[in-house]
């Protein structure tokens, strides 16, 4: 089979026709001739006379190939075409069919082509149509090399050849610096990474890149342009690669599989990040505190803790977050969306952290054990936080008041005290709270729900903490002891209020009259003086009370119930406070001391009466004769003089 020659792919122009061409068309003639020459040489074909190249480069008229070739053949303008530049018959047929097809579309029916020119007259182009022919030819010759695999076309054979390598997966060009393999164009760009060279700079923000394509993609951040749209859901993206990855969500395709655990991913980058879980690799280290992270994004978001920056802001309520995922989860509060579903029971949550906590209900496995106290946890993070109780470490400090906390979440909640922020609102009554847990407990007032029941007496409570405190009544446990006088209490709150007796502090102040008290209960009782509203009425006798607790205590009088029993003598009482006072008879405890004379009493009421001796105050007056007394009992005895009753 005959091989391709330089003349086999030629369209001819006569000297007369040549004169009709303008300079731009003549330049095109030269470029096409040179391109064809180079393509044939790159395939190993030999052109006999090297002077041909000089002729083509300096061309001012159609090149006379008689001078440059052994066979006397007329001048020609060449337009390259080849699948692989195979033997002459295939190339001639394909080339001429393509040229004719392209030219016919342009309306040049009179153009005639031949397979291998022998005379000038064999290839004729009508005068006056040369300009159109050249326009067609310039389009044709610019996309002439076609890939067999993907039908992509190229203007240069060398580009076509490079492109074909992509289908084989072969990357023949190796980086001498790191040994990685690339395609030629990619290698050039890659070497810039080692050199630190970033010649492409963004005019908007000044950020520099080592690739022009990277700069082009970056610019879309400023313009907001998202040219790549998903046909499935209409979502738009800045980059085609991101769109391709996104499409896998719809197809369910997960081509990247972890060899360690078999988990599959839609992206290779996600797989690479996942592998760090198995290797334990944490390459991204915080310069501020030394903490290491698996992912660069985690490090960047962690840095916000040190800077205090909260770049992610909710458009709905204005709340700002350090992490983008925290903002995304927060948005679910506004939308009501609960995307995190428990696989075991189907319960849904609006935050992933809530789901993680919930899962521990189903799984009793607690792998992480505290060496200090033996307490076990389902998560290592929980163990690390727990350890701070033993070490006393409180890394999260409030900038407002200096108070420190074990956990960042506790600090976040604490800050609301200073800001006054109450983001959790009750839909029932409109009352707002600064903690979600407080809102949940509040809702039980409306629902009447009391899920925490005492096994001892059957009493139910809205809070687990209240139940735990209540249990101490049955056990007699008093873990909170006063260092000043040794008195012990069931509740820490009671101890704190008791301390006010020793310090003389009276933090509970009445807004109506300004009177202050050292105990909150004293203020609550006092308030009833100003308010005559008694909402809680006894159905038995009609007596009304300002507090529900007072009504409940009162009801025991009618029922005869005496649940508070003295272990010492067996005597029972309807009030826990009465039992407490009674116990002092057995213990001999006299916690109430007169500051004037040092005398001690077992009841506060006895101390109050005693103080009248020192003050001389006589607040109990006889309505009959006006005589005054310092004790009500003395007044009662005195009244018998007027009634005529004898003193018994």
UniProtKB/Swiss-Prot annotation:
Task: Please name the InterPro entries in this protein's record.
Answer: KRAB, KRAB_dom_sf, Znf_C2H2_sf, Znf_C2H2_type
Show where the KRAB domain sits: 4-75
Q: What are its GO cellular component terms? A: nucleus
Query: What does this chain do?
Result: May be involved in transcriptional regulation.
Q: Which GO terms describe its molecular function?
A: DNA-binding transcription factor activity, RNA polymerase II-specific; RNA polymerase II cis-regulatory region sequence-specific DNA binding; zinc ion binding
Q: Which family does it belong to?
A: Belongs to the krueppel C2H2-type zinc-finger protein family.
Which cystines does this chain contain? none
Q: Which SMART domains match?
A: KRAB (SM00349), ZnF_C2H2 (SM00355)
The record places its C2H2-type zinc fingers at 145-167, 173-194, 200-222, 228-250, 256-278, 284-306, 312-334, 340-362, 368-390, 396-418, 424-446, 452-474, 480-502, 508-530, 536-558, 564-586, 592-614, 620-642
Q: Which CDD domains match?
A: KRAB_A-box
Instruction: State where the protein is found.
Output: Nucleus
Q: S-adenosyl-L-methionine: is it a keyword of this entry?
A: no
Q: Which SUPFAM superfamilies match?
A: beta-beta-alpha zinc fingers (SSF57667), KRAB domain (Kruppel-associated box) (SSF109640)
Query: Sorted alphabetically, which keywords does the UniProt record give?
Result: DNA-binding, Metal-binding, Nucleus, Repeat, Transcription, Transcription regulation, Zinc, Zinc-finger
Q: Name one Pfam family in it.
A: KRAB
Question: Does Transcription regulation appear among the keywords?
Answer: yes
Biological process, per Gene Ontology: regulation of transcription by RNA polymerase II
Q: What is this protein called?
A: Zinc finger protein 595
